[in-house]
């Protein structure tokens, strides 16, 4: 019997001025996303992923401790609890990117994964934390992830998460494949002029190299007063052959929906035996910061 799964992505602009009280910003963004989740449900989506740090702006464009107030515990926090109810209502798996507080002063860029019956399955914490031009000052806000590369067994399929800047590192994408992922979601916040030319290269390459589907999500619009640039949207799904099968616009709030045939994974892997032909015993330099020179010295 074919394993077809209807999946959805939500890309959205910031709802309120960044100068408004944080509680108002959070409420406005959650209300906006709840309406879009309803749209995804009407389109019969079974698995849904929201964008990176979905309930606020991309505040990493500045270094300001004010934004620490957006943190919450996972899964005990209000956003995860709310989305558990929403997931159960719609019988929908939801990937929920939040700003997580582990303890005061220790924060993570996190995605909670909720099954279609509302059960919290676990979380992924972003591993690779950028601090670079034109305004990605994430080391001020986030501790590097410490939970590995989990794959979540949901009602509809095996789901992995790789957040934004993670996508530039093929190692974790490969581990997600080895861990059994069928669909990998990459919730992001990325702007034109820096990595847009990579947007449709890297993640289809991950899909091909690892034989799984990828859902890539980016927000839209500009967020003042920061001059980081335009978030260019263009959220998409691609299949294990690296083909983009549906893609959103670059400037509109959208719910992107695609039917994914999970049987394609086995079809592709019967042709391209990348997992069989791996040579992990030769990859020692990948586990050292200095690469081949350090491995040779050992």
Spell out what each predicted region is.
Residues 75-95, 158, 164-255:
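CN hydrolase (nitrilase-like) catalytic-core segments centered on the catalytic cysteine
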Residues 15-27, 137-138:
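Acidic/histidine-rich helix-loop elements
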Residues 218-298:
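C-terminal beta-strand edge segments of enzyme domains
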Residues 96-98, 110-113, 150, 235-237, ...:
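Short beta-strand scaffold segments in enzyme catalytic cores
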Residues 7, 113-121, 238-246:
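Short, glycine-anchored, charge-dense loop/turn motifs used at functional sites
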Residues 1-16, 23:
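Short beta-strand segments enriched in small/hydrophobic residues
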Residues 72-75, 85, 102-182, 192-205, ...:
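Active-site catalytic loop in hydrolytic enzyme cores
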Residues 7, 37-66, 87, 94-95, ...:
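Active-site beta-strand/loop signature of hydrolases that rely on acidic residues for catalysis
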């Amino acid at each position: 019997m074919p394993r077809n799964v209807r999946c959805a992505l939500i890309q959205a602009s910031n709802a309120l001025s960044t100068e408004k009280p944080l509680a108002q910003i959070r409420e406005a963004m959650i209300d906006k996303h709840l309406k879009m989740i309803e749209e995804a449900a009407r389109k019969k989506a079974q698995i849904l992923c929201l964008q990176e740090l979905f309930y606020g702006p991309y505040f990493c464009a500045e270094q300001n401790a004010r934004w620490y107030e957006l943190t919450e515990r996972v899964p005990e926090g209000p956003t995860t609890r709310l989305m558990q109810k929403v997931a159960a209502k719609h019988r929908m798996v939801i990937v929920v990117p939040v700003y997580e507080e582990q303890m005061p002063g220790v924060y993570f860029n996190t995605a909670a994964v909720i099954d279609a019956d509302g059960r919290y399955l676990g979380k992924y914490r972003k591993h690779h934390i950028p601090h670079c031009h034109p305004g990605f000052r994430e080391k001020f806000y986030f501790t590097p992830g410490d939970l590995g590369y989990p794959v979540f067994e949901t009602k509809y399929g095996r789901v992995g998460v790789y957040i934004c800047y993670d996508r530039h590192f093929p190692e974790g994408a490969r581990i997600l494949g080895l861990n059994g992922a069928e669909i990998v979601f990459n919730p992001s916040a990325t702007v034109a002029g820096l990595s847009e030319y990579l947007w449709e290269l890297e993640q289809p390459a991950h899909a091909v190299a690892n034989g799984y589907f990828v859902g890539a999500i980016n927000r839209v619009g500009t967020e003042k007063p920061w001059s980081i640039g335009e978030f260019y949207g263009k959220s998409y799904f691609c299949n294990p052959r690296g083909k983009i099968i549906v893609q959103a616009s670059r400037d509109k709030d959208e719910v992107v929906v695609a039917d994914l045939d999970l049987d394609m994974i086995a079809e592709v892997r019967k042709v391209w035996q990348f997992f069989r032909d791996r040579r992990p015993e030769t990859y020692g330099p990948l586990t050292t910061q200095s690469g081949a020179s350090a491995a040779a010295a050992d």
